[in-house]
Amino acid sequence: KEFRVLHTTYAPGGQNPKHYHPSHVVFYVLEGSGVWQEEGKDPVTLKPGESLHVRPGMVHAHRNASTTEQLVFLEFVIVDKGQRSTVPMR
């Protein structure tokens, strides 16, 4: 297994379309405001210091809620060595 920490920055209005992760993922916001939406659930807005757990296989999308400020967050994931941590939806 590998423990990965991804440091991600979205420009104002930036987004990641629907996708899923093959393992548990925890998102932690460092700067800005982001909206995460799991399929079939209401959207959740996260601000600095807040986190969200996403279960394996849960289809979701996330975006920067601001049109003027960047969104910066950490993504914590444990995967099998060599395994992709994100699978896009087609």
Residue ranges: model-predicted function:
Residues V5-H7, V26, S51-H53, E75-F76:
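Conserved hydrophobic/aromatic beta-strand scaffold that supports enzyme active sites
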Residues K1, G13-Y28:
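A short beta-loop-beta micro-motif enriched in histidine and acidic residues
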Residues K18, W36-Q37, H60-T67:
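Short beta-strand His + acidic residue motifs that chelate non-heme Fe in jelly-roll/DSBH
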